[in-house]
Amino acid sequence: MATYSVHVKWGKEKFDNVEVNTAEPPELFQAQLFALSGVPIQRQKIMGKGKTLKNDSWDGFTLKDGMTLLMMGSNELVPTPQLGTKFIEDMSSTELNKASSFPAGLTNLGNTCYMNATIQCLKNVPELKQALERYDGKLNIGSIMSMPSDAITISLRDLYNVMNKTSAAVPPIMFLQVLHAVFPHFAEKSEQGGFMQQDANECWTQLIRMLQQRLPPLKTDSDSNLHKSSFIDQYFGISFKTVLKCDETDLEAETTLTEHFYQLSCFISQDIKYLNSGLKSRLKETITKASPVLGKDALYTKSSLISRLPAYLTIQFVRFFYKEKEKVNAKILKDIKFPMTLDVFELCSSELQEKLKPMRDKFKEEEDKRANEKLLQISIAANNKKLPFEFSDDIGSNNSGYYELSAVLTHRGRSSSSGHYVAWIRKQEGLDEWLMCDDDNVYAVTSEDILKLSGGGDWHCAYVLLYSPKSLIVADEKNDHH
């Protein structure tokens, strides 16, 4: 058993230095070729020195470093034979996806719904997909452990590329292998030998952390642009202005610091019924820490306000807590309502609120204008333009405090390490069209279905929310000659 570097010829194309590990099943090698060529595994025929590779074994198939293998197979969608009218209820999920141009689903490879749901939600950020497309490099199996963030970034890029080429369900074999290599605890197996269910939000935060290390920041010609070290910091980074005041002595001066996060947390308590109040309740809390003045642990009031908003706001409902007796992350099922349009103005510092006001005024002007046009039945100009959602000196920020719900990651079950995770995504920005991505099945759903994900029972229950910047579309006066 060994690792080899081979070349693969496919028609007029040639893939150089593809790594093959014969300790892994051939399907993993085929998944790499699928990522490179788009040829589904079941259509691949791989030959070397007069032998054809079997799907389940390397037996009789000899490899050497630098040898060239021949692959045959088409990456084009097979035309559906004309069998007359086929009704929706008779269609398979793949046929339905193809018929309605739905995005590709992801095959569940054994309790991998936590990963599939995370991948589908993050795919709903167009700027992230573009940043991944700009990222160079090929996956090198041998260097996964020395460059884990590089391997995660490349394998996610390649997976999205494959998903964009098809409407059939995609088996994310290569990405799962990399995820397991980088985070071995995600590869834990049950007594029955299958993969154990994992926490989807942990998968989400680990992917964001890996991408943060690799995706470079976008740059402009302006010297005034606030410097961020990564694309993730620009588009997902939240900054808090935090003040710590000791409750037990007036001799200790207040401490002001800036904290950075990629998620907001909505803690769930008996009196919390709405997302906004859950977020607001954590802005002021009492903590215990060492007091340099008193020389002992003391109580402090920690007051936090948002000083920088990202374009994409991620919010986690803290629904799981550890039950010592059962040794399980048990779930809080409480119903917490969340809105389609979120306004976080009240959570922001006074300095940020002042910066947000000009764009908020424009939103108000446009709403009033459209209300009057509707009242007077005047047609709204067709020549519309979208105003920037970010401050000119801060790429990837939000300049209004207004957000639109883009994706919901849900959990159904009673603990984070069991049950089932699903992604619910807005099909297109600004449109009230939603999709439920349940592993390989993708279904059309309504906004009413989305709002029913607030919890309170054994139905799918919101665990992570992804909000995108609410766009302001105005008439382009340069083109408007009315």
Where do the language-model regions lie?
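UBL (ubiquitin/ubiquitin-like) substrate-recognition surfaces
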Residues: 1-482
